[in-house]
Structures are given as C-alpha cells and as structure tokens.
C-alpha cells in the first residue's frame, strides 16, 4: 500500500524533463533580462526548481533573489508581471502548451 502512495506523488519523466527545460530557459531569460520586468533586476533572480503539474499546463517556479533579500517582494513582482515572463518564454520554447507560471519563494 505504501508503494502506491509514493508512486502517486512521484513526478513522471515527462514532468521532470519539461520542468528542467522551463527552469533552464527561465534562468537564461532572467540573466538576459528578456522579460523586461519593471522595478526589478532579473539578473539577480535564481530559479531553484520548477515543478510541473501532470497535465503540464501549470509550472510552480521556485525563485530566490541574490542574497535572499526581499524574497516576498520579488515573488509579488514576478507574479504581477508573469504575463511578460510567459511571453518571453514563449519565444524560447517550442512546446504544445506554454504552462501558466506560478512563482513561489524558495526557503
């Protein structure tokens, strides 16, 4: 019984692969400031992890600013301007559905 519960929580290879692809591209996008997010220096943002939902339509993006300062504010700004991040990401990724991005502070 325990094996079934742990396998239900495990991520599929596809989720892991797409999550890693999104993570790499978001990292490059932030370094190059391609999203043009006002009031934030995206070069100072680190994407630590991306977790995809089973349908690959939503990505939970774990971020931390350099030095771990103002994490909540950084997440708030990224959430507010997530449409700009998605637009920039769409130019980099060739996948069927571009996931909705949910930004979360990494502890």
Regions found by a protein language model. Name each.
Residues 1-58, 64-107:
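Charge-rich, low-complexity N-terminal segments
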């Amino acid at each position: 019984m325990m094996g079934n519960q742990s396998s239900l929580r495990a991520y599929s290879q596809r989720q892991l692969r797409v999550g890693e692809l999104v993570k790499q591209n978001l990292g490059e996008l932030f370094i190059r400031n391609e999203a043009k997010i006002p009031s934030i220096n995206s070069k100072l943002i680190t994407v630590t992890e991306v977790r995809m939902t089973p349908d690959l339509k939503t990505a939970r993006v774990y971020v931390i600013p350099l030095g771990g300062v103002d994490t909540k504010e950084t997440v708030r700004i990224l959430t507010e301007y997530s449409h700009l991040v998605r637009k920039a990401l769409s130019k980099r990724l060739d996948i069927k559905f571009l996931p909705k991005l949910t930004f979360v502070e990494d502890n």
